[in-house]
Amino acid sequence: MKPTVWHHLRLCPHGHPDETIDDAAIAVDETGTIAWLGALSALPHGYAHWQREDLHGAWVTPGLVDCHTHLVYGGTRADEFAQRLAGVSYEEIARQGGGIVSTVRATRAADETTLFVQAAARLQPLLAEGVTAIEIKSGYGLDLASERKMLRVARQLGERFPVTVYTTFLGAHALPPEYAGRADEYIEEVCDRMLPTLADEGLVDAVDVFCERIGFSLAQTERVFEAATRRGLPVKLHAEQLSNAGGTALAARYRALSADHLEFLDEAGIEAMKAAGTVAVLLPGAYYFIRETQLPPIELLRKHGVPIALATDHNPGTSPLESLLLTLNMGCTLFRMTVPEVLQGVTRHAAAALGRADRHGALEVGRQADFAAWSVGSLAELAYWIGRPLCEQVVRGGTTVFRRMNG
């Protein structure tokens, strides 16, 4: 690529609307790295002959980060939607053999090509909203071959699309039918066979567990964390979504990257997260879709200074959401977060939730030039509009990978 100066833009380099530069410029060298950024009037003379790209006054933010998704799976769970509307709870559907296990059946039956095509269709709307990094979990295979298949598809998405994909092994997502009544044996399979094999194949960047009364116990979760730690892999946790099971405090003991959901999180868990540097990942899409009523403890998270990230939690059963911008709106309207909080929640804090704050979530000299240009008058509009296409252009590594067509 040619060295380029992107100019005539309003810059929000760290995802905070109170830290901006009007009439700014970003100089990107031939490697796709930011060489300089600041006010256009201060652009050094050495960049005068570089190629120019006019952004016509657009707001520019770091590329967005969707730090919690289940993007790869077979089928849908649209049939369960009517059950929910009739008052059947998520837990009851799961106990009847629906929920996660129904998606497991569809995922096991699908080949890699089918899973890739379906996941690609889910990914593309996110890319058109400025997402340049995304986490994708396994967890709908629940056997070695099927978990491998999911993680391979996630890696392929990162190779075929202009987005950085981080994979998370979520073998301990649910108990597969063939292990009914034998949860400890299944956890042994996860720890002793599945995780080591998939890690050795280079398919795992982090390890997650669903710690809930309809998922896995604290003791079982700790066994998975121990296995991940032995492999040198960071951990994260689905925690306190349906009850206060104490999973967050356990995750903090293992210095988890993040604890996610957190509707029933208590102050002791928050204090443990703060001490461990664990990010709180809130998932308003799931809260909305299954009509939860217990709000996550936003005020306590603020009080203790725990960084808060937001994510789509895209999945077929509780959050079939393909819009990180709608997630921002939900964070404000449902969780009563501020605009600065939600914007940092999908940039700087989301990157930290992946353990990649040094690579994503901010625009700084020496970093890869991943950014999004927005046709808005103020950054608050990113959380304000519902359904309006706001992203004009997405740049990844200094190359335009998306441009909205007008007319």
Swiss-Prot record:
Q: A GO molecular function for this record?
A: iron ion binding
* Compartment annotation: Cytoplasm
Residue pairs linked by disulfide bridges in the UniProt entry: none
Q: Does the keyword Cell membrane apply?
A: no
Question: What Enzyme Commission number does this protein have?
Answer: 3.5.2.7
Q: Which cofactor names does the annotation list?
A: Zn(2+); Fe(3+)
Q: Which residues bind Fe(3+)?
A: H68, H70, H238, D313
Q: Where does N-formimidoyl-L-glutamate bind?
A: Y140, N315, G317
Instruction: List the catalytic activities from the record.
Output: 4-imidazolone-5-propanoate + H2O = N-formimidoyl-L-glutamate
Pfam families, sorted: Amidohydro_1
Q: Where does Zn(2+) bind?
A: H68, H70, H238, D313
Name the principal localization, coarsely classed.
Answer: cytoplasm
User: Which keywords annotate this record?
Assistant: Cytoplasm, Histidine metabolism, Hydrolase, Iron, Metal-binding, Zinc
Q: Name one GO cellular component term.
A: cytoplasm
Task: Provide a GO biological process annotation.
Answer: L-histidine catabolic process to glutamate and formamide
Question: What pathway does the annotation place this protein in?
Answer: Amino-acid degradation; L-histidine degradation into L-glutamate; N-formimidoyl-L-glutamate from L-histidine: step 3/3
Q: Where does 4-imidazolone-5-propanoate bind?
A: R77, Y140, H173, Q241, T318
Q: How is the cofactor bound?
A: Binds 1 zinc or iron ion per subunit.
The protein's matches in CDD domains, at most eight in alphabetical order, are given as: Imidazolone-5PH (cd01296)
> What family does this belong to?
Belongs to the metallo-dependent hydrolases superfamily. HutI family.
Q: Which PANTHER family match?
A: IMIDAZOLONEPROPIONASE, IMIDAZOLONEPROPIONASE-RELATED
Role summary? Catalyzes the hydrolytic cleavage of the carbon-nitrogen bond in imidazolone-5-propanoate to yield N-formimidoyl-L-glutamate. It is the third step in the universal histidine degradation pathway.
Protein name according to UniProt = Imidazolonepropionase
